[in-house]
Amino acid sequence: MKIVYQISKEFRDIEGSICISGSKSESNRLLLLRAYTSYFKILNLSDSDDTQLMISAIESDKKEINVGHAGTAMRFLTAYFSSITKKSRVLTGSDRMRQRPISILVDALKDMGCDIEYLEKNGFPPLKINGKNI
């Protein structure tokens, strides 16, 4: 049985700011939300390395992005780069990151029409992501 979810977006601008607790988890989720929408200000954004990495990766035009040890960034950016950009990107990480499975997410994204390839070991980063609007 295949379950299909349809997500649509309204084309309205968001204005204002969001004040958060400063946690890395909240910060990274809101950065991704902001990347999908019009700009809004996030107050009390975490200054963690993972959050700084998310900011630079979202804003980057580089073809290869290294997330180091940041597992949340690897997963969030896999979905983000798969779904919005019409560019090819390589998403990689540390030696340890390349030992962490990511096939459940990649399989789900492929089922939605995303174009993702494993560059080394099947089921693990690094990934080549050929982005497209889904």
Language-model segment annotations:
Residues M1-I134:
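Structural preference for solvent-exposed beta-strand-turn elements
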